Amino acid sequence: MAGSLNEIKSKIASTKKTSQITGAMQMVSASKLAKSEQLAQSFQIYASKVRQITTDLLRGELMASDTSNPMLIRRPVQKSGYIVITSDSGLKGSYNSSILKAVMGMIEQDHDSKDEYEIIAIGSMGADFFRARGINPVFELRGLADNPSFEEVQKIISKSVEMYKNELFDELYVCYNHHVNSLTSQVRVQQMLPVEDLDHNEADGYTATFELEPNREVILEQLLTQYAESTIYGAILDAKTAENAAGMTAMQTATDNAKNVINDLTIQYNRARQAAITQEITEIVAGASALE
């Protein structure tokens, strides 16, 4: 009986240590979440302004004639590009599995062979997932900070836009978990290129005029590139916010489960201890009766 009590006591102690670890990780994730939410919200001010300027230009008189900018032209789709954003580690609940499942489902539905798409992987979990299935990402980024600056992701963003311009693929999507709140995220697949949701035909009668230097083509090239890059970066910040929220929720769940286990083990320990005491009393009474 003593051995059983010691075993239960040992389990309680180890579970308490686990609870302390997951509780600390929950607090760290909560701090990361607050910072990533603030960064994402701040960047949206800039991204919205870039979108507004781009929309105004595309709706203005400078778009009265056809444009040859490749970022606005829909080509016959022979190959698609997917930027897939995941985390670099586990302990994120269903954060990684949900987006990877959605991407694989889309690939299986829309493509007949690996020659019809390219994967650009942000995050080790996604990169390793695709490599394990014989799909080698054309470009990948690992070890991204919890609150990445634009400089940290500029290379992979610029490379993605460059590959589209060079016709390595004919359309580009970004696939990630959109942060709704601390408990909820939604899988989002957003078309980045070609730029279609800023069609100048949306606003007939728009009369804005612009004076552009050095010329229309140069301004469009720079602005559309900046728009695409800022949109992709915004998606990365959104995904990082969802990742931190998922990590916080997962650690909170683990902490709560550990506390439940501790409570169950404590009840089990008390019952075993009570049984041991009762047995000892019974043995003492029996011994005393035998001496009479």
Swiss-Prot record:
A GO term from the CC aspect: proton-transporting ATP synthase complex
CDD domains hit by this protein: F1-ATPase_gamma
Alphabetically ordered keywords of this record: ATP synthesis, Cell membrane, CF(1), Hydrogen ion transport, Ion transport, Membrane, Transport
Subcellular location: Cell membrane
One GO BP annotation of this record: proton motive force-driven plasma membrane ATP synthesis
One Pfam short name: ATP-synt
Gene3D superfamilies to which the protein is assigned, alphabetical: 3.40.1380.10, ATP synthase, gamma subunit, helix hairpin domain (1.10.287.80)
Coiled coil: none
MF terms (GO), sorted A to Z: ATP binding; proton-transporting ATP synthase activity, rotational mechanism
InterPro entries: ATP_synth_F1_ATPase_gsu (IPR035968), ATP_synth_F1_gsu (IPR000131), ATP_synth_F1_gsu_CS (IPR023632)
Membrane-protein topology: Peripheral membrane protein
Entry-linked PANTHER family: ATP SYNTHASE GAMMA CHAIN (PTHR11693), ATP SYNTHASE SUBUNIT GAMMA, MITOCHONDRIAL (PTHR11693:SF22)
Family statement: Belongs to the ATPase gamma chain family.
Assembly information from the UniProt record: F-type ATPases have 2 components, CF(1) - the catalytic core - and CF(0) - the membrane proton channel. CF(1) has five subunits: alpha(3), beta(3), gamma(1), delta(1), epsilon(1). CF(0) has three main subunits: a, b and c.
Biological role: Produces ATP from ADP in the presence of a proton gradient across the membrane. The gamma chain is believed to be important in regulating ATPase activity and the flow of protons through the CF(0) complex.
The protein's name in its UniProt record: ATP synthase gamma chain
